[in-house]
C-alpha cells in the first residue's frame, strides 16, 4: 500500500501517516463563517484539502474516509449584517434575517467551491444544529475544573492545560507579555477564552445553565468534531491563520474534556495567499472573491490549477500570468485526451502527492504524461487532483475553433469606426445560434456601455453556463466590439431566454 507522508504542524516534522482505523480514516477541516462571499484566500484550503481527501480515498478506498467541514452560522459578523438589514427597514424578525443570510451564503459557497471542482465533504454540520453538544461539553469542562462561570460568561481556564501553546510554539507567559488588549474584569487570567457568552433580547441565543446566550467560536469545532469523528481522529486541517488562537484553543478544550482521546493526531496548515506579490487587501484594491474571478471569465478549473501550482506549505501568489498559463495547459491536455478512456492513476502522479501533498510535483508528472502522449494515463491521473479533462473539453474556453463569422464589416484603420461583433464556434454554427449569440453580445455590450456592470456580469455568467463565452475585445483602432465563443453543444432555446 502507498505510504503517505505529511508535515505535522504540531511535531514540526514530516511523518509517515498511519491511520487509527484504515477502514475509517477521519479528517476535519475548519469551514467558513457564513456572512459573505468566500474570497480567493478562503478557496485555497478547500482545494488543498480536497486533494488530500481524494488521495486518502485513492489509498484507503472511497467508502473508508470520513471528511467533516463545518459551517459557522452563529457569529457577531452575521448578527451585524442582519441588524443592518433590520435597521434599514426590513420588517422580518432578526432570526429570519439571520437564517436567510446564512442559507444564502452557504448556497453561494457551494456554488463557488463546486466551480473549483471540490468534492462535497461527508458531513457539513452547521454550528446552530449542535448547540446541545456544545453546552454538554462546557458543562463537562466546568465539572472537571477547566472552566468557570462569571457574569453569564463561561471561560476556559488556560493554565489548567499544561500543554497550551504546543501547536503554535508559544508559552502562556510570553503571550500575556505580548498582549495589547484590555482584559475583561470577569476573567481569572488574561489568556482565558470564552466558551459561552450572554445574549441580550435583540441577539440570537439559546437557553443554558448559565442563562440565555450563544457559544464562543472555538467550542463549536471541538463539539462537532467529537460528535462526528470521536475523541481521537486522524487529521485536523485549516489555514495558517487559524493555528492560533483557534486551533490552540480547540486542542486545550478537547483534550481537557476528553483526556483519554488526545484529539487530532496530525495537524496540517496551508499558508496564506498573495495577489501579485502583495497581501490581499481591500485597501490595496487587490481583494477578490472566488465569484469575482469566475464572473471575470476565469474558469474554476483554471483557478484550481493556480492553487495547485504551489505547495500548500508555502505562500501562494495569484497572478493573471499564472492563470493564463494554467488555461493554456488545460486546453492542451483536454485536446490530447479527446476520445480517450480514463486509464489507471499513474504512480508518478501518486508519488509526489503522497510526499506531503506535493501538488506542484504532481502537475509536473501530468505534464510528462502529456509529453509522452499517454492520454489514458493523463485523463485518469488528473482526476486525482480534481481536474476533469473530459468535462473541460466541452467548455467554450477550452475548444479549438474552426472558423469565424462576423456580423457587420471588419474594422479597418481609418475606414470603419463602428463596433462589430463576431461569433466563433466548433464545426457549423446554425443561423439561429449565430443570431442569438450576436443578440446576446449586443445586449451585453450595451449594458457595459451604460455602466450596468452587475446585470452585464450576470448575463455573461448565465451565457457561460449555457455554452457561450461573451468577450469584449478592441480592434487595432481602439473600437470596442465583442466576440462570442460557442461550445460544440449549445442549447439555443435556453439562450434565447436571456434576450
Curated annotation (Swiss-Prot):
SS bond partners: none
Cofactors (names): Zn(2+)
Aminoacyl-tRNA synthetase as UniProt keyword: yes
Protein name per its UniProtKB record: Cysteine--tRNA ligase
BP GO terms, sorted: cysteinyl-tRNA aminoacylation
E.C. number: 6.1.1.16
Motif ('HIGH' region): 32-42
GO cellular component terms given for this protein: cytosol
Single Gene Ontology MF annotation: cysteine-tRNA ligase activity
Localization (cell): Cytoplasm
Family membership noted in the UniProt record: Belongs to the class-I aminoacyl-tRNA synthetase family.
Record carries keyword Cytoplasm: yes
Cofactor binding description: Binds 1 zinc ion per subunit.
Catalytic reactions on record: tRNA(Cys) + L-cysteine + ATP = L-cysteinyl-tRNA(Cys) + AMP + diphosphate
Organism of this sequence: Cereibacter sphaeroides (strain ATCC 17023 / DSM 158 / JCM 6121 / CCUG 31486 / LMG 2827 / NBRC 12203 / NCIMB 8253 / ATH 2.4.1.) (Rhodobacter sphaeroides)
Binding site for Zn(2+): 30, 221, 246, 250
Assembly: Monomer.
Binding annotation for ATP: 282
Short motif ('KMSKS' region): ranges: 279-283
A Pfam family it matches: tRNA-synt_1e
Alphabetized UniProt keyword annotations: Aminoacyl-tRNA synthetase, ATP-binding, Cytoplasm, Ligase, Metal-binding, Nucleotide-binding, Protein biosynthesis, Zinc
